[in-house]
């Protein structure tokens, strides 16, 4: 039995390390990750990559930490407390990326979940341009799960190909985007469709109405899995993306298989979002999200019950999806 496994067996308690930036408002970054891990009864450790000055209105300052300090934090955590799951969030500059990659190899981390932090929900750029190719070169080979929204995924592919990918006009275009990312290394690619609305013909529409729909998608290199849902016109809640990837990592730390871990994390985040009052102020929405996530953890893991028609493989994508779209 490997050291990571023996540690978890000995303590009988799942552990997870998050490597990300600090959000002083508590709604995103390291602070969000640790809240979600606690809700899943996972022991969370943290390595700061940057200090940020931010809240629900925007970011006023990003201060990257020196790579040597990032390395010393990782060593302090993983030389003492063994774990096999690492979640990676904000990486503001490329200098720290080789350090993180070397640490993942040194400590034999098997389950790495990356949250694409290129642009914040408020539209702030969160990393230097050279960070993207450095991430693909050094970190993508380690990834079990890469999670992003459609907009950030498009930017990542654009920077990788050094040219704009085909324009996104339809559902199959989103699938093509995911398959390109999968070929870069991650075993599972997760795209949240919050920013994209589809009409009944599976075309992307810029004028969504009550019949518009969206979907969160998972691609494992063989099949696409679709979590179809009504399109929500409200903007993202500060901390949504961090919470999703922290939930995936927490589920993995609890020995839930990857596809199920992703599926249940998507469900718990969506469950929590539905319980946020739409007329609340932005800061209070984040607070409500984490409160709801604390309750949704009751339904996570093997206890969660999902409607099979909302989570389907791509056996007959068009006919199955159209059967669920209002006519």
From Swiss-Prot:
Name the GO terms of the biological process aspect: thiamine biosynthetic process; thiamine diphosphate biosynthetic process
Q: Major location, coarse class? A: cytoplasm
- What reactions does this protein catalyze? 4-amino-5-hydroxymethyl-2-methylpyrimidine + ATP = 4-amino-2-methyl-5-(phosphooxymethyl)pyrimidine + ADP + H(+); 4-amino-2-methyl-5-(phosphooxymethyl)pyrimidine + ATP = 4-amino-2-methyl-5-(diphosphooxymethyl)pyrimidine + ADP
The domain of life for this entry's organism is Eukaryota
Location(s), subcellular: Cytoplasm; Nucleus
Keywords from UniProt, A to Z, are: ATP-binding, Cytoplasm, Kinase, Nucleotide-binding, Nucleus, Thiamine biosynthesis, Transferase
- Species of origin reads Schizosaccharomyces pombe (strain 972 / ATCC 24843) (Fission yeast)
* PANTHER family named among the record's database cross-references: HYDROXYMETHYLPYRIMIDINE_PHOSPHOMETHYLPYRIMIDINE KINASE C18B5.05C-RELATED (PTHR20858:SF20), PHOSPHOMETHYLPYRIMIDINE KINASE (PTHR20858)
What is the recorded name of this protein? Putative hydroxymethylpyrimidine/phosphomethylpyrimidine kinase C18B5.05c
- Signal sequence, renumbered to the chain: none
An example Gene Ontology cellular component term from the record? cytosol
What is its biological role? Answer: Catalyzes the phosphorylation of hydroxymethylpyrimidine phosphate (HMP-P) to HMP-PP, and of HMP to HMP-P.
Question: What Enzyme Commission number(s) apply to this enzyme?
Answer: 2.7.1.49, 2.7.4.7
Q: Name one Pfam family in it.
A: Phos_pyr_kin
Which residues are involved in binding 4-amino-5-hydroxymethyl-2-methylpyrimidine? 54
Which class of enzymes does this protein belong to? transferase
Q: Extract the GO molecular function terms from the UniProt entry.
A: ATP binding; hydroxymethylpyrimidine kinase activity; phosphomethylpyrimidine kinase activity
